[in-house]
Amino acid sequence: MTHPYTYIDPNARIAPNVKIDPFTVIHGDVQIGEGTWIGSNVTIMDGTRIGKNCRIFPGAVLGAIPQDLKFSGERTTAEIGDNTTIREFVTINRGTDDRGKTKVGNNCLIMAYSHIAHDCNIGNNCIMSNSVQVAGHVTMGDWAVVGGVSAVHQFVNIGQHTFIAGGSLVSKDVPPYIKAVRNPLSYGGVNSVGLKRRGFPLQQINHILDVYRTIYNKGFNTSQALEFIEEELPA
């Protein structure tokens, strides 16, 4: 159902059971999957792809051109997976180079005032709390959680099942399964609570803890830590 005060470009492809509230504007080559709800005053730009059963709250701007001086009008996309919620005033820019894309996976929650810049790849089941700012070319693994008002530097890789505390400045890669805190960023142990919530068996969590302690707490260099893990902590 589409409200009469909504503008939809004739080139947009929208599933028949999508609900779009008033004063939303949809430009150009846009695709929206079935069961999705688009709130009022949302702007969806050319090149945006939205999956099934998503919820887009008022004020969001999706698929705007990248904030990158080298962009020169190439055909790029911003792609949002199924069952993802985009809260108020979130901005997601599309990719930069020809056929480039910004991608947000399935079952994600992107809270109010967050920004996802060009060419990011956000995995499935990720959560960004309010006002998280993610710079370009960031990769985020599945089940990552980023606390509010955190900033993520461009080209950073964030591993799966990580937890980043609110207000952190993420200026370096964050390995999988761990907690990252403070500014400057430091690693704060294994994300045991998150792993338990996601059904990891206790034996597996303890193995991850042993590996973490070997790498970060025993005083080994990287080669020594890897050798110790292979010999003493077989998977």
Segments the model singles out, each with a brief description of its role:
Residues 2-186:
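Structural signal for interior beta-strand "rungs" in well-ordered beta-sheet cores
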Residues 197-235:
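An accessory alpha-helical subdomain
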Residues 184-202:
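SDR active-site lid
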